[in-house]
Amino acid sequence: MSPNVVADLEGLAALREEWQALLPESLSPTPFQTWEWHYHWWEVFGAGSAMHTLVLRDRGGLVGIVPLMWHRKRWWEGGLRELRFADTGGMVAPYADVIFHRGRAEACAAALLDHLEAERGWDRIVLRGVREDSQALGIVRQEAERRGRPFEVVPQDWGLFVELPASFEEYLAGMRRSTRKHLRRDRGRLSRRYRAELSVCGAQEELERDWQALVEMVRERWRGRGEPTLFDDPAHVEFVGRFLHSLYPTGAVRLLRLTLDGEPAGLDVALLQGEVCYLWYHGYRNPRPQDSVGEVLTVMAIEHCIEARRFRRCDLLAGDFEHKRRLASRRRQIVTLRRYAPSWRSRAYRLAAVVARRRASSGAPPRGGDSGPGCAGSGPGLP
């Protein structure tokens, strides 16, 4: 196994074709491990950060990618140097992971741990936004435990998903009776008042139009609540727009549009990877206060996935929200994997982090360490 580190955008650009060929052959791939996601993340958010993308080759062929970055904590937080997933600042992937070829995963895990042990510049490794059932990182965790240097596993969030049945009626039958009743009532109300139609964005020109409409819908809704949204950040809007436009020609993006009497009322970004449809961002506006366009849109998107006959799962991503729990019967734990270097400084910081977490759980204000805002790193879910 031959490891190499890519440290700049030029090197990342050169990996495009190999990366795209490896991903479908890897364990548990998602759209958030695509080359398009990582390249555009570095374009938009990478200024001032140090790329550390570990590339693993076997007999010249690409078999593994570990997209890491260097991050130095501020001096009042100890000034520690962290190795972390590359997209954990500015814009966080709902599901972060490594990319290992399914036939070489054990060798890739061993090569990754060998690299980390040889790389002496880090005080702590922090891998946020990890699905606990990740096959690739599960193999890494097993190998680390075998070597006597296990990762700490810290619960972070929940990701909710639907195992798609053969029919939409079967999906509804699996819900609680009260939920099913409310969904039918809300959908029936829209159908009686309006001509409700769900369509799929066609040409790439429509993607730009619908994407901007979604952004405005999200901003309007959250301004009405007097709360900020991720879409208030121009960099966030720029990143997602570049990512969608870059991925769209591959057929991995669907923008679902709900119109009421011909006027756009809701838009849902669906990302496709293999047999899984990921419902990412959505925006909507209710023509009347009693209309439930947002939930009806999500239900219609799930129905669209069932009727497509090519998906086995519809993933609502990270964020354990009530509206998701009503629609999704399954969930997975999202965790942070953490490991400290065997140094006095790392041990002192680890102790301070434990104290900070205990203070936070007791209701006392934190004093540095791990408990500050943004440390959870959960995926965006619905903005």
Segments from the language model and where they lie:
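Active-site/acyl-donor-binding loops of N-acyltransferases
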Residues: 1, 5, 9, 70, ...
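A conserved beta-strand-loop-helix scaffold within acyl/acetyltransferase catalytic domains
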Residues: 3-85, 127-290, 381-382
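A gly/proline- and charged-residue-enriched helix-loop-helix capping module
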Residues: 86-121
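A short, internal acetyl-CoA/4′-phosphopantetheine-binding micro-motif in the GNAT/acyltransferase core
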Residues: 94-105, 282-290, 320
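Conserved acetyl-CoA-binding loop-helix of GNAT-fold acetyltransferases
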Residues: 104-115, 290-302
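Hydrophobic pocket-lining residues that define ligand/cofactor binding sites across diverse proteins
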Residues: 116, 247, 305
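Conserved GNAT acetyl-CoA-binding A-motif
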Residues: 121-130, 305-318
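Hydrophobic, well-ordered secondary-structure elements that form the walls
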Residues: 262, 294, 298-301, 305, ...
